[in-house]
UniProtKB/Swiss-Prot annotation:
It is linked to Deficiency in GMP-PDE activity cause accumulation of cGMP in visual cells. The elevated cGMP levels are associated with degeneration of the photoreceptors and blindness. Gene3D superfamilies: Retinal cGMP phosphodiesterase, gamma subunit. GO terms for cellular component: plasma membrane. GO terms for molecular function: 3',5'-cyclic-GMP phosphodiesterase activity; cGMP binding; spectrin binding. It comes from Mus musculus. Pfam families: PDE6_gamma (PF04868). This is Retinal rod rhodopsin-sensitive cGMP 3',5'-cyclic phosphodiesterase subunit gamma. The gene is Pde6g. Participates in processes of transmission and amplification of the visual signal. cGMP-PDEs are the effector molecules in G-protein-mediated phototransduction in vertebrate rods and cones. Residues 1-12 have a biased composition (Basic and acidic residues).
Length: 87
C-alpha cells in the first residue's frame, strides 16, 4: 500500500499562459520650449504718474534713468511681473 497522498498539479492563479504580449511603454516625454508665448502683451516700461508732482523733486524733470526694474514697473503687482518673466 502507498501511504503518500496523491500529488496533483499545482497551477498558479496569477500567471496567464497564451495571452497577448504587449511591450510596456514608459511615461510620455515632453519637450520644453525655449521661448515663452503669452496670450496678452507684456507690460511696457515706464512709471505712471511720476514727474514733477513729488515734493522736492521739481527740478529733476521726468527724463530720469531707471536704475532698478522695480522703478520701471512700480505700477504693476509682483505676480504680474512674474507672469511676464520680468522678475
Amino acid at each position: 500500500m502507498n501511504l503518500e497522498p496523491p500529488k496533483g498539479e499545482i497551477r498558479s492563479a496569477t500567471r496567464v499562459i497564451g495571452g497577448p504580449v504587449t511591450p510596456r511603454k514608459g511615461p510620455p516625454k515632453f519637450k520644453q520650449r525655449q521661448t515663452r508665448q503669452f496670450k496678452s502683451k507684456p507690460p511696457k516700461k515706464g512709471v505712471q504718474g511720476f514727474g514733477d508732482d513729488i515734493p522736492g523733486m521739481e527740478g529733476l524733470g521726468t527724463d530720469i534713468t531707471v536704475i532698478c526694474p522695480w522703478e520701471a514697473f512700480n505700477h504693476l503687482e509682483l505676480h504680474e511681473l512674474a507672469q511676464y518673466g520680468i522678475i
